[in-house]
Structures are given as structure tokens and as C-alpha cells.
């Protein structure tokens, strides 16, 4: 029985991983479609589309899926949905601020799913503007270290408009104004430095430190929100101390 139980558990875990992978692929494809619709279907002349395609490729999205999404967005093929971007605001456990970015073809469904995820996981919705002011839109580029030093990265991107380089342990995070994102990304490429992702993101201006129990609750809320097909990104101002992060990895 123990063998069967272990197999069943493994099968369940694989199903969960496959489901999450499928959701991630769908969200990356949606980004490509919207970027192509907004700025045209040529990645060379549409930096947002270029970055959306690069992110999808690095996440192993099949090239055929990427190309079909690009064509749907640009109008070369029929079948693209009327995607709308909506941002919802709220608070999670311990007063952690939460911004939820949705890309949906059904506003009512998106609002309902976000509200249910929030209320079932210790959060509550907030009025527009009551949370957003705690975040600033920034350009964010992440790259693996690969024997690079912080000085190497700074030297490559400082003149291109980078504001900060953060050491995340196994990787670096470069922060810039959204308008400088393409210039910073291009500077990395010119220096022969590969990067994982480049995108506009919300960065918190004030963070809320949490203990292990609160961190688990907030991450459970984030998981529930990200489980919605309409949710593209979830941003919080949670600050997880190193000892709490280490304990979370053991969960």
C-alpha cells in the first residue's frame, strides 16, 4: 500500500505541476497576443512584444504557440480575444498590500474570481487608489549570475538608465524607469550578458516584514489569486526575512 500511496502522491504532484505549467503558458501566450495587438506584430519594432516572446521562450513555450499568438494579436490570423487590462487592489493577512493585474475578456468573471480568492484567504478588496499609491511602476530585468559580479552588471547598464542592481542570491535584479527598460536591456545585450526576463513591474515603496505564519498565509493568498486564468500578475509589499525564507523552503 505504501508504494501505491507514494505513486498516487507523485501522480498528484505531477498533475499540480502540469496544471500550473499550463496556466503559466496560457498567461505568457496572452501577453504576446496583447503586445502584438498594441504595438504591431514585428518584434524588431515592438520591444514589449520582443520581451514577451523572449520570456515565453525561456519558459519553454513551444514556438508554434508563440507564433500563433503573435499572428492572432497582429491580425494576421483570426481568433484573438478582446483582452482588457484591469487592476484590483486589496489587503492580505497582516495588512500586506496586494495589487492584482488581470488580462481578461470578461470583467465580471475576473472581479468575482479575485474577490473570492481574497475573501477565502484572509484578504479583502480595497477602493481604487487606496493601495496603488504604495507601489511604483518600474522596469525590472532579472539575470542569472553566471560568475558575473555586481560591478560587471553596473558597468554594463549604468549609462543606459539603470537605477539599482539588487543581489538576489543566485541572480541579479536591475531596476530602471519603465521608459529606460529597452535601453538597459540593449546595453546588457551589447555587453554580451544574457538575461532571464525584462518587463515593467510594480515595486513597493514601503514593505511589511512578516513572520513564518504570516508569510505562509500571504503566499497562500497569492497562489489562490494566480490560480485564476484571468490574473496575470500579483504584487505585494511583503518583506520575507532570510530565516523565514529558509523555513518556507523546507515546507
Curated annotation (Swiss-Prot):
GO biological process: regulation of DNA-templated transcription
Superkingdom of this protein's organism: Bacteria
Gene Ontology CC terms, in alphabetical order: cytosol
MF (Gene Ontology): DNA binding
Coiled-coil regions, chain positions: none
Protein's UniProt keywords contain Transcription regulation: yes
InterPro entries, per the entry: Integrase-like_N, TACO1_YebC-like_2nd/3rd_dom, TACO1_YebC_N, Transcrip_reg_TACO1-like, Transcrip_reg_TACO1-like_dom3, YebC-like
Keywords per UniProt: Cytoplasm, DNA-binding, Transcription, Transcription regulation
Protein name per the record: Probable transcriptional regulatory protein Mvan_2570
Organism expressing this protein natively: Mycolicibacterium vanbaalenii (strain DSM 7251 / JCM 13017 / BCRC 16820 / KCTC 9966 / NRRL B-24157 / PYR-1) (Mycobacterium vanbaalenii)
Lineage: Bacteria, Bacillati, Actinomycetota, Actinomycetes, Mycobacteriales
Amino acid at each position: 500500500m505504501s508504494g501505491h500511496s507514494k505513486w498516487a502522491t507523485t501522480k498528484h504532484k505531477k498533475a499540480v505541476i502540469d496544471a500550473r505549467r499550463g496556466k503559466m503558458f496560457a498567461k505568457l501566450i496572452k501577453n504576446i497576443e496583447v503586445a502584438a495587438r498594441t504595438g504591431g506584430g514585428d518584434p524588431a519594432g515592438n520591444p514589449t512584444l520582443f520581451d514577451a516572446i523572449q520570456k515565453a521562450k525561456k519558459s519553454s513555450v513551444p514556438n508554434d504557440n508563440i507564433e500563433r499568438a503573435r499572428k492572432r494579436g497582429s491580425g494576421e490570423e483570426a481568433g484573438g480575444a478582446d483582452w482588457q487590462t484591469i487592476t484590483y487592489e486589496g489587503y492580505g493577512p497582516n495588512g500586506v498590500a496586494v495589487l492584482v493585474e488581470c488580462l481578461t475578456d470578461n470583467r465580471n468573471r475576473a472581479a468575482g474570481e479575485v474577490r473570492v480568492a481574497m475573501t477565502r484567504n484572509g484578504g479583502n478588496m480595497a477602493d481604487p487608489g487606496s493601495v496603488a499609491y504604495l507601489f511604483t511602476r518600474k522596469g525590472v530585468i532579472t539575470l542569472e549570475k553566471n560568475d558575473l559580479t555586481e560591478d560587471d552588471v553596473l558597468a554594463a547598464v549604468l549609462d543606459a538608465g539603470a537605477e539599482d542592481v539588487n543581489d538576489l542570491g543566485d541572480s541579479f535584479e536591475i531596476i530602471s524607469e519603465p521608459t529606460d527598460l529597452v535601453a538597459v536591456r540593449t546595453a546588457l545585450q551589447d555587453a554580451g550578458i544574457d538575461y532571464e526576463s525584462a518587463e515593467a513591474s510594480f515595486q513597493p515603496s514601503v514593505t511589511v516584514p512578516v513572520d513564518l505564519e504570516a508569510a505562509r498565509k500571504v503566499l497562500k493568498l497569492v497562489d489562490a489569486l494566480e490560480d485564476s486564468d484571468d490574473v496575470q500578475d500579483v504584487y505585494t509589499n511583503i518583506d520575507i526575512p532570510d530565516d523565514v525564507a529558509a523555513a518556507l523552503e523546507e515546507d
